[in-house]
Curated annotation (Swiss-Prot):
CDD domains: PI4KB_NTD, PI4Kc_III_beta
Primary localization class, coarse: membrane
Native species: Bos taurus
Assembly, per entry: Interacts with ARF1 and ARF3 in the Golgi complex, but not with ARF4, ARF5 or ARF6. Interacts with NCS1/FREQ in a calcium-independent manner. Interacts with CALN1/CABP8 and CALN2/CABP7; in a calcium-dependent manner; this interaction competes with NCS1/FREQ binding. Interacts with ACBD3. Interacts with ARMH3, YWHAB, YWHAE, YWHAG, YWHAH, YWHAQ, YWHAZ and SFN. Interacts with GGA2 (via VHS domain); the interaction is important for PI4KB location at the Golgi apparatus membrane. Interacts with ATG9A.
Entry annotated with the keyword Membrane: yes
Gene Ontology molecular-function annotations: 1-phosphatidylinositol 4-kinase activity; 14-3-3 protein binding; ATP binding
Sequence positions bearing Phosphoserine: S258, S266, S275, S277, S284, S294, S428, S511
Record's protein name: Phosphatidylinositol 4-kinase beta
UniProt keyword Kinase, yes or no: yes
UniProt xrefs under PROSITE patterns: PI3_4_KINASE_1, PI3_4_KINASE_2, PI3_4_KINASE_3, PIK_HELICAL
Family: Belongs to the PI3/PI4-kinase family. Type III PI4K subfamily.
Length: 816
């Protein structure tokens, strides 16, 4: 064998660990690379073998025949054989080397040989410790991304690329922007290490494929047009958009038209059988998103159609895997662009409702909302519930989307279309007395719309939206009260124990709940979103479900999304990642700070979707609608100072304010007017709109100079400067900063990798990363940090620029 290293045996698609301990011929060295990294069934054999060979060949070239043991220690291969008795760990120099070194005297040649051996020994030790780190439990996805970005060794990069297969999908998905940005803008070795994982996941998940295609397009847009056309990012995007990465199991199932054998699995787990509605849904809004047939005969004969040859169209032979979803997204973006041309909010709202009504004719279809965290099909958009959001120059809008949850998007048939007037047939059931009908029984039937009166016109489709605006109060039936008390009495009799109830406590709690029910906002033509956002989410879900022809289905869900056109959401995505990382750090360090990062979908360099924050309205809307100070609004919503509800809301306010103050300080978030700060029903504040972070500011003026926004109104809610909650706020700030700087590298690398090849304004200037690191104050003691926090809090609270900027926003945009 000479000095050759044993070739690793190819990986088999099995979940069993790599065979054999070191020294057992085939597979021994492969186990070095894969030992302790989890299930191997997801690792592509060629990828693993290539990575293994590159690592071992690199080690061999550097160290002249030195391999690595399964323990991660460097081994000297005597005569090329990996025999245990002849393997020596180089952590301690072998006796032969020590004897040779003693014999080497004053000659230059002998000195050179001695230095070479020492360098070889040191390099081997470094390789030993590196591999030990890679195989340890401490090696997480954050460290993998760091080594992939910083390492210049192709072998290490290949190993990390292979190791990606062993992390959880959701962990890798968090760093997808970083992985794709490295693929686009870094050298070929990094790209070659990343690509196998991306291709593998694209075959597994259509949603992952969509996000990769969108991000590759958005991050390639910063390149010169001639370079972009031939870049590796553009080529990978074209590969994803083609049907070459369609899951293999779908291709194999195409010829089969007969029903799958009943194996005891649920229908969604059996082999997918195309129905007519499924087939037609693969066509777009113009040619790919075509609605399912609305013929009642078709809708009632799904089982017949599932095995019919007429259910097959040419969608399988043409590259349309992502086409319906892309057309769906294009339609939503086109609506936003058309709305921006209209002068008034009222006109925009009317046009939005009309556009969405037309879009409903194309649904259900094989489309989904990428911001959701579960598989589903979009079946309906309740168009009358959509609202246009506040924006001076653009027209972002909020829509609610009805979906049917499914186990697997690729293999589940598209639901059949249910006509809007189908809801009329439920009237007769509604007239039945409710006594004796459980909540679950009502939810499982079509009878979900309250019987308001006997006027048939109340059920017309055109009037559903009006009925949904202001629902009359639903009075509890007397028989419901009887049933409830009967259950209570039976329970107490079975216990055979006397039940003592503090009547005073009951009266106090009931009076608090009745007196401090959350207030509703009035309709404002200039701000139509205020009423929609103020309505409690659960109430909105119930109301929309009652008016939906799909609401009776048990897997019905309601989602919401904000559609933005003309805005670059890549900075928003970067801010989301940093805040999400900070949230994880504080949870790990058990610091009770509260922030709520919301999901961002980058569609292009100037469009995207945002996950709305439910049960929350902006402080501007609060002040405009209530005409109260922030503290008085808290008292109105949650009760007096001593009530449990107020104290809980106050604590939530303090914990969230401290969390966002730290996040805004580290990211240098600007444009902090009251329209960009939300207040939820539980008292938390949530910052939104991170279009100006790090090196960028509105109009590049750098006007907001304070570390973060902390107004006297915020301090009043905390109980004033001398209050315990204000001291608690400063303590949380200190604890949060100490915890964050322990994990500084995890935060900094998110930003540093995205700076590669980027033209985003937040990266203008050469000192962006250096300034970010300085804000962690790594050289300060905890006592010095405490003094720093005191200074930042005091400076932000007294900042004249914050007051001037709020005044400027009020004068120019009417933001209170």
């Amino acid at each position: 064998m000479g000095d050759t290293i044993v070739e690793p045996a190819p990986l088999k698609p099995t979940s069993e660990p790599a065979p054999g301990p070191p020294g057992n011929n085939g597979g021994s060295l492969l186990s070095v690379i894969t030992e302790g990294v989890g299930e191997l069934s997801v690792i592509d054999p060629e990828v693993a073998q290539k990575a293994c060979q590159e690592v071992l060949e690199k080690v061999k070239l550097l160290h002249g025949g030195v391999a690595i043991s399964s323990r991660g220690t460097p081994l000297e291969l005597v005569n090329g054989d990996g025999v245990d008795s002849e393997i020596r760990c180089l952590d301690d120099p072998p006796a032969q080397i020590r004897e040779e070194e003693d014999e080497m005297g004053a000659t230059v040649a002998s000195g050179t040989a001695k230095g070479a051996r020492r360098r070889r020994q040191n390099n081997s030790a470094k390789q030993s410790w590196l591999l030990r780190l890679f195989e340890s439990k401490l090696f997480d996805i954050s460290m993998a991304i760091s080594y992939l970005y910083n390492s210049k060794e192709p072998g290490v990069q290949a190993y990390i690329g292979n190791r990606l297969f062993c992390f959880r999908n959701e962990d890798v998905d968090f760093y997808l922007p970083q992985l794709l940005n490295m693929y686009i803008h870094m050298d070929e070795d990094v790209g070659d290490a990343i690509k196998p994982y991306i291709v593998h996941r694209c075959r597994q998940s259509i949603n992952f494929s969509l996000q990769c295609a969108l991000l590759l397009g958005a991050y390639s847009s910063d390149m010169h047009i001639s370079t972009q056309r031939h870049s590796r990012g553009t080529k990978l995007r074209k590969l994803i958009l083609s049907d070459e990465l369609k899951p293999a199991h779908r291709k194999r199932e195409l010829p089969s038209l007969s029903p799958a054998p009943d194996t005891g699995l649920s229908p969604s787990k059996r082999t997918h059988q195309r129905s007519k509605s499924d087939a037609t849904a693969s066509i777009s809004l113009s040619s790919n998103l075509k609605r399912t047939a609305s013929n009642p005969k078709v809708e009632n004969e799904d089982e017949e159609l599932s095995s019919s040859t007429e259910s097959i169209d040419n969608s399988f032979s043409s590259p349309v895997r992502l086409a319906p979803e892309r057309e769906f997204i294009k339609s939503l973006m086109a609506i936003g662009k058309r709305l921006a041309t209209l002068p008034t909010k009222e006109q925009k709202t009317q046009r939005l409702i009309s556009e969405l009504s037309l879009l409903n004719h194309k649904l259900p279809a094989r489309v989904w909302l990428p911001t959701a965290g579960f598989d589903h099909h979009v079946v309906r958009v309740p168009h009358t519930q959509a609202v246009v959001l506040n924006s001076k120059d653009k027209a972002p809008y909020l829509i609610y989307v009805e979906v049917l949850e499914c186990e697997n998007f690729d293999t589940t048939s598209v639901p059949a279309r249910i006509p809007e007037n189908r809801i009329r047939s439920t009237r007769s059931v509604e007239n039945l007395p409710e006594c004796g009908i459980t909540h679950e029984q009502r939810a499982g039937s079509f009878s979900t719309v309250p019987n308001y009166d006997n006027d048939d016109e109340a059920w017309s489709v055109d009037d559903i939206g009006e009925l949904q605006v202001e629902l009359p109060e639903v009075h509890t039936n007397s028989c419901d009260n009887i049933s409830q008390f009967s259950v209570d009495s039976i329970t107490s009799q079975e216990s055979k124990e006397p039940v003592f109830i503090a009547a005073g406590d009951i009266r106090r709690r009931l009076s608090e709940q009745l007196a401090h029910t959350p207030t509703a906002f009035k309709r404002d033509p200039e701000d139509p979103s205020a009423v929609a956002l103020k309505e409690p989410w659960q109430e909105k879900v119930r109301r929309i479900r009652e008016g939906s022809p799909y609401g009776h289905l048990p897997n019905w869900r309601l989602l919401s999304v904000i559609v933005k056109c003309g805005d670059d959401l890549r900075q928003e995505l970067l801010a989301f990642q940093v805040l999400k990382q900070l949230q994880s750090i504080w949870e790990q360090e058990r610091v009770p700070l509260w922030i709520k990062p919301y999901k961002i979908l980058v569609i292009s360099a100037d469009s995207g979707m945002i996950e709305p924050v439910v049960n929350a309205v902006s402080i501007h809307q609060v002040k405009k609608q209530s005409q109260l100070s922030l503290l008085d609004y808290f008292l109105q919503e949650h009760g007096s100072y001593t009530t449990e509800a107020f104290l809980s809301a106050q604590r939530n306010f303090v914990q969230s304010c401290a969390g966002y103050c730290l996040g805004c300080y580290l990211l240098q978030v600007k444009d902090r007017h009251n329209g960009n700060i939300l207040l939820d029903a539980e008292g938390h504040i949530i910052h939104i709109d991170f279009g100006f972070i790090l090196s960028s500011s509105p109009r590049n003026l750098g006007f907001e100079t304070s570390a973060f926004k902390l107004t006297t109104e915020f301090v009043d809610v905390m109980g004033g400067l001398d209050g315990d909650m204000f001291n608690y706020y400063k303590m949380l700030m200190l604890q949060g900063l100490i915890a964050a700087r322990k994990h500084m590298d995890k935060v900094v690398q998110i930003v540093e990798i995205m700076q590669q090849g980027s033209q985003l304004p937040c990266f203008h200037g050469s000192s962006t990363i250096r300034n970010l690191k300085e804000r962690f104050h790594m050289s300060m003691t905890e006592e010095q940090l405490q003094l720093l926090v005191e200074q930042m809090v005091d400076g932000s609270m007294r900042s004249i620029t914050t007051k001037l900027y709020d005044g400027f926003q009020y004068l120019t945009n009417g933001i209170m």
